[in-house]
């Protein structure tokens, strides 16, 4: 199972996971209890229960580069363009906007 830490600005907001049945996103309890907590997307409102989807959530898929940037990522990191979680974890550490995703290494789990 591959996972990534999701940050808003530099604040840890939650975890996105790839599971055998699809994808899960869950806000961290610490983030949910912050006074100024905001959802990462209107499609992923603040809630304690995890979100589940068979495909990568549209919001996260939208963070992945397109066009020539996707071609460069595919060539440089040898990632198949259909491996959306692999692209998200590799390419979205420093995105345009205030949301970023950092991979969780095996040892961190």
Feature roles, as predicted:
Residues 1-109:
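Phosphate/dinucleotide-binding and metal-coordinating scaffold of catalytic cores
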